[in-house]
From Swiss-Prot:
Residues 451-468 have a biased composition (Basic and acidic residues). Residues 2-159 form the Obg domain. CDD domains: Obg (cd01898). This is GTPase Obg. Keywords: Cell membrane, Cytoplasm, GTP-binding, Hydrolase, Magnesium, Membrane, Metal-binding, Nucleotide-binding, Phosphoprotein. PROSITE patterns: G_OBG, GTP1_OBG, OBG, OCT. It comes from Mycobacterium tuberculosis (strain ATCC 25618 / H37Rv). Residues 160-340 form the OBG-type G domain. SUPFAM superfamilies: Obg GTP-binding protein C-terminal domain, Obg GTP-binding protein N-terminal domain, P-loop containing nucleoside triphosphate hydrolases. One of its GO terms (molecular function) is GTPase activity.
Length: 479
């Protein structure tokens, strides 16, 4: 069973809004109480929240489907439905959210950072909210909108100050275990490290984190070996350290060629974040070189031989042995100083304020195009939303939809394009036979659907009239 997962594809479905209620107020001595249907509750959204106690995306590996609660339906007596609860999902710090096309949606850094992955649908209006001066007793209500549904890719990019890179079996895991309390798996065969290992290193009053990235080989930036899957974990590292095995017996390898090969792979790799968080490109990050395994006599000689050549590149060079712990303290304090210098030299990242992007107010645009089969297709945010809100089992609701489309100008545009009575018109997922409200060329008269003529009448039978009527019925019965 995998213990560390740093890339998953998940399926999110926010809650749908509740349906509005169509009801009439019923109360003693109030025969015409009017509409009192409540609105439906909004659907729950799916929100990612950064939790420092979460370190992997393993939970999403086994449960990739996330569904939020839907809103409750409205009820009579002007009672609105309850809103669906938001589904808050905990993710590790450093999680990057990508859409289906690979576009970056969010870079979640910092405890408590939130991102709305899928928005809940709006609740439908009840007939009380639909009542107006000309529509005093609507016999229908609007349906709730569907919640947002989409597939997302989550990638975890480790947050560490120092990233250790090197060929397999260079001693990176041994170095992490020697300078920190981390206990990574260590063995004498290549690719022992299959997941990044993090360790916290203390340097006097300061502390920093070190990430051990699985071994790289030539072509890692193009997907060879394990490098492409784990190179993303060094994107956030402030300092990159080349760990070189000076005791290797492989032909054609030496410290200089190993460093050049690693630099080639780093130069070919394109980070997803593109210098976000003010870290800059990988090529601009400070470097250090660790010549490892100098406890072997031949390795010590080789390290001393190439040390000056590497130092000419302007990189600090440390000759260490994780087996005997030789020169580990100079390495620890040297890396701590490099991190401090780099952080002091780079510009201070200005905290980004949360950006609220409201739903566009002007969504009245629409297009009408022939479908090639004698029908027409109407596209537009507002008409498609109205279709989803309409209960087609209610004739009055369908009439209300026709009025809304006519006011928007859809009927006029269909007539202009030569639409005839009975032709197929598709809006969203609904296809129906179109019937114009008025003949072509005549103005569209907006009817007050949902009106009740009894509400406009003041003719009510009083107590005296009812008493007289009872007397007449008695007399008629006696006769």
């Amino acid at each position: 069973m995998p213990r560390f997962v740093d890339r998953v594809v998940i399926h999110t479905r926010a809650g749908s809004g509740g349906n509005g209620c169509a009801s009439v107020h019923r109360e003693k001595f109030k025969p015409l109480g009017g509409p009192d249907g409540g609105n439906g509750g909004r659907g729950g959204s799916i929100v990612f929240v950064v939790d420092p106690q979460v370190h992997t995306l393993l939970d999403f590996h086994f449960r990739p489907h996330l569904t939020a609660a839907s809103g409750k339906h409205g009820m009579g007596n002007n009672r609105d439905g309850a809103a669906g609860a938001d589904l808050e999902v905990k993710v590790p710090e450093g999680t990057v959210v990508l859409d289906e096309n690979g576009r970056l949606l969010a870079d979640l850094v910092g405890a408590g950072t939130r991102f709305e992955a899928a928005a809940g649908g709006r609740g439908g209006l009840g007939n009380a909210a639909l009542a107006s001066r000309v529509r005093k007793a609507p016999g229908f209500a609007l349906l709730g909108e569907k919640g947002q549904s989409r597939d997302l890719t989550l990638e975890l990019k480790t947050v560490a100050d120092v990233g250790l890179v090197g060929f397999p079996s260079a001693g990176k895991s041994s170095l992490v275990s020697a300078i920190s309390a981390a206990k990574p798996k260590i063995a004498d065969y290549p690719f022992t490290t299959l997941v990044p290992n993090l360790g916290v290193v203390s340097a006097g009053e300061h502390a920093f984190t070190v990430a051990d990235v699985p071994g790289l080989i030539p072509g890692a930036s193009r997907g060879r070996g394990l490098g492409l899957d784990f190179l993303r974990h060094i994107e956030r590292c402030a300092v990159l350290v080349h760990v070189v095995d000076c005791a290797t017996a492989e032909p054609g390898r030496d410290p200089i060629s190993d460093i050049d090969a690693l630099e080639t792979e780093l130069a070919c790799y394109t980070p997803t974040l593109q210098g976000d968080a003010a870290l800059g490109d990988l090529a601009a990050r400070p470097r250090a070189v660790v010549l490892n395994k100098i406890d072997v006599p031949e390795a010590r000689e080789l390290a001393e031989f190439v040390r000056d050549d590497i130092a000419q590149r302007g990189w600090p060079v440390f000759c260490v042995s994780t087996a005997t712990r030789e020169n580990l303290q100079p390495l620890i304090f040297g890396l701590s100083q490099m991190i401090s210098d780099y952080n002091a030299a780079r510009p201070v990242a200005v905290p980004r304020r949360p950006v609220i992007r409201p739903i566009p107010v002007d969504d009245s645009g629409f297009t009408v195009e022939p479908d090639g089969h004698g029908g027409f297709v109407v596209s537009g945010a507002r008409p498609e939303r109205w279709i989803d809100q309409t209960n087609f089992d209610n004739d009055e609701a369908v009439g209300y939809l026709a009025d809304r489309l006519a006011r928007l100008g859809v009927e006029e545009e269909l007539l202009r394009l030569g639409a005839r009575s009975g032709c197929a018109v598709t809006i969203g997922e609904m296809t129906f036979d179109w019937e114009p409200q008025t003949p072509a060329g005549e103005p569209v008269a907006m009817s007050g659907r949902g009106t009740d003529p009894r509400l406009d009448s003041n003719k009510r039978v009083g107590a005296a009239e009812r008493k007289a009527a009872r007397s007449r019925r008695r007399e008629h019965g006696d006769g």
